[in-house]
Amino acid sequence: MEPLDTLNLWMERARDRARAISFGRFLWHRFLDDRLFQAAAALAYTTVFALVPLAIVVFGVLSAFPVFDRWSDQLSDYVFSNFVPNAARAAEGYLRQFSASAGQLTAAGFIALVVSLLITLNSVEETFNQIWRVGSTRPKLTRFLVYWTVLTLGAMLAAASLAVSARVFAMPLFGTQEGRWLAELALRLAPILIEFVCITLMFRVVPHHTVKWRHAVPGAILAAVILELVKWGIGAYLGSFQSYQKLYGTVAFVPILLLWIYLCWVAVLLGASLSSSMAAFRYQPVELRLPQGYEFYGLLRLLGRFHHARAKGKGLADDEILRLEPMLTDSLLQDLACNLQEIGLLRRDERGEWLLSRDLDQVSLADLYECTQLRIPVAEQHLPYRDDSLGRAALAALDDLRLPLRERLKRKVSDIYTDSGDMP
């Protein structure tokens, strides 16, 4: 889908008042469920311990390639000049000193630094998986390869972009007045564009979930805007409140850096929550909503879809499942899929599609009941799609469970104690 088509689609949906209100409520509940501010605090804490290992890895990668080594100082200066408050610039010197002393580390010290970096990256992935409601994680080796690729390629691409930019801005075109104005505009917009691109790629790569561009881009825009507002707010506050330097002295950069890291994670996680909400939101008219307590009916329909897909030799992606079964929400689908994965009934392939990994004749209703812990509904409710072939089959199986139970539940509680005799 083209970006313009996506924009028109969302504008059309925004004009639907019921849909807009429903999405607003859904987004608010997702914000609360994700506990973003607590997650940002945890990530900020682990990030502080990973700053030195991260600097060692980045500068170590650049120094390994002579063509990039001479750009490491410019890269460090550019990052701290454009993405970190001026009050925290002192951290740059300390990180450079620690990186220069990395060669004096013992094997145990180097391993400890690498472990702290991997813990931080693993925490980021776990937080993103939680936001996207992903119950499974990548294999450990795959995770390590992804982390290492992001760190090494990210450092080299950043240095390469600086080298290309310097070569481009040295062209005669930028020696004219119009060229200088264009160069100044590009330099002003570059930090925002870099933030936007990095966050978009983060949303696409980090979660163990297929995130579409049309969902990642709006979340990245929100995160980049919040980051710019945070930078402006911190600069305005510190510019009007100078006593913090007298209070903290030479370590004044420490609380500023901690606050900045925390607010950066808040911005990124808010954008991630918006992206996941846009992907998960399904507007359901009242007549198509699955009644509360009838999730078992949805489970039986879901397994029917997998049974038919397996007969055709294919799997089902999340989007296709939600299209086939619009009564299911994304959260319910992820919960059911994770429960079925735990008992080895489902597995996810390398393309992110779900596949049946066992024959259904090897699975009983008791197995489904035990692994999902879903209730067996008793009351009568209008069920969506009950008249199609899949609905009739699922409802018949559900009636075999609930109708005898309904008769049993008509028993009076007092009958339980009629023949119990005297209490001890």
Curated annotation (Swiss-Prot):
Cystine connections: none
Superkingdom, natural source: Bacteria
Organism expressing this protein natively: Stenotrophomonas maltophilia (strain K279a)
Subcellular location(s) of the protein: Cell inner membrane
GO cellular component: plasma membrane
Transmembrane portions of the chain: 48-68, 101-121, 144-164, 181-201, 216-236, 251-271
Record-linked HAMAP family: UPF0761
Similarity annotation: Belongs to the UPF0761 family.
Membrane topology of this protein: Multi-pass membrane protein
InterPro entries cross-referenced by the UniProt entry: UPF0761_bac, Virul_fac_BrkB
Keywords: Cell inner membrane, Cell membrane, Membrane, Transmembrane, Transmembrane helix
Identification of the protein by name: UPF0761 membrane protein Smlt0865
